């Protein structure tokens, strides 16, 4: 069970143009999707101008039939428009190089990225290993076997799990999990297990940090734990609108919501801008730093500074050997050999920053339930509460490990 295509250190390179928008390449090691692009508009473009641009693209596309290389099947053209808050407007589509060149020369376009493959971030699997992460979250010292917590914490809060789905019928969720939206296939189930494991750590009755939180499945990764960057952004857009009162943005609704993204890929300015729009809407988001033992600045959405980026620790309070690190990491959380939910009323033990991030998402829900203010500022609260525990956290990286403030 894996996460991410290895987020190799990549610097996005501008391929063109002098007068038009930059067309960004994710480098030779990124797994790009042929002819698929994400087009990001300038921040000051109005909704009316965005709609006019979409009409222009449609008219231009219809006048010039495009076919995929080696196939008689036509290209799709514009496929989905994104609008996250007032700051991020974009669309995804399938175009040939000539059409993309024309789009890049449009005055309203900021930049264009090739769409890339994104994967989940668990990296190892081991059966029947006792979990230690919960005890560590509720204690100032390592080595405990009891989780100390307030049993009302998390109630009234909703956690959106942007992942492979959730087995909503698993007994550990106690009826608090529901299906949200599927952006990757036609199976409204977790056929991979990654998302259910993550959700269990956020809010399972036995395995969860916030045992009263409501959980919503937002499926963006398939049975192999793989999806597209554009599909992930679709899930982010839907979750943001739901968290903000069904599209009618309200700070009160947003402040009672948290999100978890235990996934990622090579650095993507489009993904980072979408994540920032969610933070700007007043929603707390925890994301996995990545599992490549390198600087997380090269991964997205982990490299976006306005969200809470989580590295993984081991049971002895050392940095997990696979965990990414660097200045963009906000906090460490347990991520090595973590036991949680498996579809079919089972359990599984996994390792990865995928397992660390939901500890922080769950703690965010826990603290909101206790009356702490939600939104991106909650990451600062979590850092202030944390203990200086991590040994050798990595160059330029915080040594802070999450703690729920139980007093134990």
Curated annotation (Swiss-Prot):
Signal sequence segment: 1-20
Chain residues in the propeptide: 21-123
Location of the Inhibitor I9 domain: 36-119
InterPro entries named in the record: PCSK9_ProteinaseK-like, Peptidase_S8/S53_dom, Peptidase_S8/S53_dom_sf, Peptidase_S8_Asp-AS, Peptidase_S8_His-AS, Peptidase_S8_Ser-AS, Peptidase_S8_subtilisin-like, Peptidase_S8_subtilisin-rel
GO molecular function, a single term: serine-type endopeptidase activity
SUPFAM superfamilies on file: Protease propeptides/inhibitors (SSF54897), Subtilisin-like (SSF52743)
Keyword Glycoprotein found: yes
GO biological process assignments: proteolysis
GO cellular component: extracellular region
Primary subcellular site in the record, as a coarse category: secreted
Top EC category: hydrolase
Cellular location(s): Secreted
Boundaries of every Peptidase S8 domain copy: 131-408
E.C. code: 3.4.21.-
Catalytic machinery residues: 163, 194, 354
Pfam families for the chain: Inhibitor_I9, Peptidase_S8
Glycosylation sites (chain numbering): 248, 260, 345, 404
Alphabetic keyword roster: Glycoprotein, Hydrolase, Protease, Secreted, Serine protease, Signal, Virulence, Zymogen
Record keyword Transport present: no
Physiological role: Secreted subtilisin-like serine protease with keratinolytic activity that contributes to pathogenicity.
Family: Belongs to the peptidase S8 family.
Protein name: Subtilisin-like protease 6
Organism for this UniProt entry: Arthroderma gypseum (strain ATCC MYA-4604 / CBS 118893) (Microsporum gypseum)
